[in-house]
Amino acid sequence: MSKDEYLITDAPLKALTVFAMPMILGSFFQQVYNMADSIIVGQFVGSSALAAVGACAALTNVFICIALGAGVGAGVLVSRYFGARDYSKMKTIVSTSLISFLILSVLLGIFGFCFSHSMMSLLQTPADILDEAVLYLRVYFVGFPFLFMYNILSTMFTSIGESKIPLGLLIFSSILNIFMDLWMVARLGLGVFGAALATLIAQGISAVFSLLIFFSRMRRYKSHFDWFDGKELHSMLRIAVPSVLQQSTVSIGMMIVQAVVNPFGTQALAGYSATMRVENVFSLIFVSIGNAVSPYVSQNFGAKKMERIKKGYHAALVLDLCFAVLAFIVIETLHTQISSLFLGKDGTALAYQVSGDYMRWLGYFFIFMGIKMATDGVLRGLGVMRPFLVANMVNLAIRLAVALIFAPRFGIEFVWLAVPAGWFANFVISYVALRKSWPTDKAASVC
């Protein structure tokens, strides 16, 4: 048995822990990568520049989620064929997805660059930070194909049980990004433009290294394959499109929520942006566990090991509980110090209050997000996409309804009061669907 097949051979808790930990560390470094811009800009340029970078976050998340969702469709099928040891189909999926998504990423990058000003204006970005926000966004879109391809390749690595290579590349690119941020922002005084340019260069180098290493890895699996297969593309899109819709729609929802926050002023936006970065750090821990569950489930489904799927789900819930407790302790103890990392000396009392209140509220309820992500991960791994999409749309609807209806009338606090309610509703719907979708040996035999 190959050492690459530990997801279908080792004890479920051990297999998921070994597989998920590099992904969790990778998520941490991904956020370090993203937060470097905010922290360095906030410390060396000021809170207005921080707000400009933060104002772009919700929009850039939409495009990142398109990349992540696109990778899900390919990743589920790669995992399934890998578990079944059908390396010919696996490599055909890999090639087809890389060609298709490279074209898509270039088109999205051109679209984003051309319409940056229009999109930021639609978000009601405060006038005093609009120009800097648009500048940051345009540089971001120049490098978008690199970001897109890196995320697709990371999904490919994890689909075959390899999560350490993406971690190594992320550590390298994060360190490079921080040093270049310090050089361009603090030393050269390039401000928001320097922060965006540093990120673009680091992403580009990381994407090229990922591509070279992945092609080298694929040579281990000797088999004939087609460079492009329309039928496999269709199969992949059946899973990818719902995932893209789910991930991008949720990010669009967050973008709309930011439009609700923007009228409260630059300092409220700075506080909200600071906590959004912190939310992303902890959220991606739970997202990583859910993403680890998907290839685990898909590989075991391909290998016709149905009982291991249930055990893997329970193991994921244990990991989620441990990290939810850790998040609560860290936020309760250090929320003021964490806020100061982003807001610096220029942050007003309002900015610190918004950041601290939002952060502590999230700390109480991260467990809901954890169990939601684990359940969604099983559904994705099984290819059960419709209830997965419905559950996430309900989550979005609750979050938007409360923010849009209550926040303008009663205060900014209602922006984050809806978050755990949406997570919990999502979990309930996903869990009911999962109970109806547990695979049987008979189902696997016709896979």
Residue ranges and their predicted role:
Residues 18, 41-61, 127-132, 192-193, ...:
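Interfacial/gating helices of multi-pass transporter permease domains
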Residues 18-37, 139, 173, 202-206, ...:
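Transmembrane helical elements of multi-pass membrane transporters/channels
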Residues 28, 32-50, 120-127, 183-190, ...:
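Helix-terminus/linker motif at the lipid-water interface of multi-pass membrane proteins
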Residues 62-65, 177-181, 206-211, 281-284, ...:
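Hydrophobic transmembrane alpha-helices of multi-pass small-molecule transporters
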Residues 71, 140-158, 166-174, 195-208, ...:
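Short runs within selected transmembrane alpha-helices of multi-pass transporters and secretion channels
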